[in-house]
């Protein structure tokens, strides 16, 4: 099974290199499967060595977006990272299932910028629990832990534990 996954990863990398050229940089070995990469001509993607995933993994880098994922990161099933500005993920990070990282909004008003966005920075050795969403403009410091189900809308200091408590009844 491990050999099969490695062979699949090599073919995936070769296809990406033929399709996107030097705008995609990939470290080896890479143990990724079921990955969808959508990248516009002006966008760049850098993947560090020994990145692993389990199950569906979507990487979207649009416009002039820049996506960088450090070495030795692990992404569980159903990960979606969509980048129109910049997303930087450090080394040795772990991500739970059903993760969404998005560095822009969809502005439904007429403000001139269709997808206003801001850089997302995730430090080294960060652990993000299942069902989390990380929104534009957020900086998560090294060794931080994000509790399951959190929506991260503001900066998280290094070494801290963040949990987004949303138990209020709205109606």
Regions found by a protein language model. Give the residues of each.
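Domain-scale signature associated with acetyltransferase and cell-envelope carbohydrate enzymes
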Residues: 1-102, 123-125, 132-134, 142, ...
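Short, acidic/turn-prone active-site loops that include or flank metal/cofactor-
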Residues: 105-107
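Short, glycine/charged-rich beta-strand-loop motifs at protein surfaces that mediate ligand recognition
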Residues: 111-112, 133
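Glycine-rich NAD(P)-binding loop of Rossmann-like domains
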Residues: 112-123
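Conserved coupling/switch loop of ABC ATPases
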Residues: 136, 154
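A generic "structured core" feature
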Residues: 143-151
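Conserved active-site beta-strand element of glycosyltransferases/polysaccharide synthases
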Residues: 162
């Amino acid at each position: 099974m491990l050999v099969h996954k490695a062979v699949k990863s090599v073919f995936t990398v070769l296809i990406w290199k033929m399709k996107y050229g030097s705008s995609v940089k990939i470290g080896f070995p890479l143990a990724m499967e079921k990955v969808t990469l959508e990248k516009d001509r002006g966008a760049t993607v850098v993947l560090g060595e020994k990145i692993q995933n389990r199950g569906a993994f979507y990487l979207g880098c649009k416009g002039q977006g820049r996506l960088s994922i450090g070495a030795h990161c692990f992404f569980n099933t159903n990960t979606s990272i969509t980048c129109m500005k910049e997303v930087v993920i450090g080394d040795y990070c772990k991500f739970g299932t059903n993760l969404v990282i998005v560095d822009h909004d969809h502005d439904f008003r007429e403000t001139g910028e269709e997808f206003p966005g801001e850089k997302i920075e995730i430090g080294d050795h960060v652990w993000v629990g299942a069902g989390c969403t990380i929104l534009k403009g957020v900086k998560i410091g090294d060794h931080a832990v994000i509790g399951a189900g959190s929506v991260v809308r503001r900066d998280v200091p290094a070494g801290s534990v963040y949990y987004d408590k949303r138990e209020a009844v709205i109606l």
